[in-house]
């Protein structure tokens, strides 16, 4: 009888301890849940406040126009699938296209949140020149003898659009990455009195790109902006690569206007078939630019 009484007391004590532990655990869970909800609510309120501040600021939209002086280098390569024909032509050295060009670029930035945004950029370069060939050239399988008067052209239209995201949460600093896609239209060709008319190569290439960008406020009115990007792709009969970077100093005398001084580099190589001939375009430009940015 005494042993039974001890067992009942032990069971009662264990039950009491279990209930006390369960109640303590429930109370702790409730406290943690309440703290989590409060933390989520505080973070949401902070995000809403940051977005409202961005909406009321002059930094949500940015439109930029730049005037660029660029040094250009352009090469065309043609190769038959059998490998019997392999020709490389420099459009500047062999066909007389100007190696320096002045052109405008335009860009637009929309900041969705203080840390993310969408942007788009456009530029176009059209070049045409009449010259006399200094050596025999092979353009798409046709031989152009030395001493032939030719008119060559190379036209480029580029649209870039993408998404950017910053890992920093600082009004005076932006450090993150971007992912974009280039839609590049290229048209090049030769006309000559030799009888070769409109030997054209046309290409519309969507090329993705990935990169890193940074922006820092140096003092009250001076900012530094920079980005660098690279991508390469190779499929069965199509391939390409893009390398670009941009360094900019921007003076901002008022909150809605920026004066930009930049140095830009853009290098693209594209391989594709054209009329049964493996064609490669290697095109790049680099040079300084000056421009204006408008914020609103």
Identify the meaning behind each predicted range.
Residues 115-118, 170-173, 220-224, 255-259:
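Repeated loop/turn-to-beta-strand initiation elements of outer-membrane beta-barrel proteins
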Residues 60, 101-105, 156-160, 205-209, ...:
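Transmembrane beta-barrel architecture of outer-membrane proteins
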Residues 80, 183-254, 266-269, 296:
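Outer-membrane beta-barrel transmembrane domain signature
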Residues 73-101, 124-157, 184-203, 233-236, ...:
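Extracellular/periplasm-exposed beta-strand and loop segments of Gram-negative cell-envelope proteins
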Residues 23-122, 295:
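Short glycine/proline- and aromatic-enriched beta-strand/turn motifs that initiate or cap beta-hairpins
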Residues 65-69, 120-124, 177-183, 214, ...:
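Transmembrane beta-barrel strands of outer-membrane/channel proteins
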Residues 67, 110-112, 165-167, 181, ...:
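Residue-level signature of outer-membrane beta-barrel architecture
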Residues 251, 283-296:
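Outer-membrane beta-barrel "beta-signal"
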């Amino acid at each position: 009888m005494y042993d039974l009484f001890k067992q009942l007391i032990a069971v009662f004590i264990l039950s009491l301890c279990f209930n006390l532990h369960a109640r303590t655990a429930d109370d702790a869970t409730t406290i943690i849940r309440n703290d989590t909800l409060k933390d989520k609510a505080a973070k949401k309120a902070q995000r809403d406040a940051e977005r409202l501040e961005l909406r009321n600021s002059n930094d949500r939209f940015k439109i930029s126009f730049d005037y660029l002086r660029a040094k250009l280098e352009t090469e065309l390569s043609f190769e038959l699938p059998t490998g019997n024909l392999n020709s490389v032509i420099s459009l500047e050295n062999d066909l007389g296209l100007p190696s320096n060009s002045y052109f405008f670029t335009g860009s637009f930035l929309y900041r969705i949140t203080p840390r993310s945004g969408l942007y788009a950029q456009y530029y176009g370069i059209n070049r045409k020149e009449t010259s006399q060939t200094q050596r025999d050239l092979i353009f798409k399988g046709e031989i152009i003898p030395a001493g032939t008067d030719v008119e060559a052209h190379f036209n480029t239209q580029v649209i870039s659009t993408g998404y950017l995201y910053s890992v920093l949460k600082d009004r005076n600093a932006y450090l993150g990455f971007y992912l974009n896609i280039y839609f590049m239209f290229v048209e090049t060709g030769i006309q000559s009195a030799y009888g070769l008319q409109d030997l054209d190569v046309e290409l519309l290439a969507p090329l993705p790109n990935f990169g890193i960008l940074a922006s820092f406020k140096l003092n009250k009115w001076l900012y530094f902006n920079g980005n660098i990007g690279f991508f390469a792709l190779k499929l069965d009969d199509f391939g390409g690569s893009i390398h670009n970077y941009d360094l900019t100093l921007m003076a901002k005398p008022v909150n809605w206007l920026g004066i930009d001084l930049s140095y830009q580099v853009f290098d693209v190589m594209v391989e594709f078939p054209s009329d049964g001939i493996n064609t490669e375009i290697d095109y790049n430009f680099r040079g300084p630019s000056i421009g204006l940015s408008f914020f609103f």
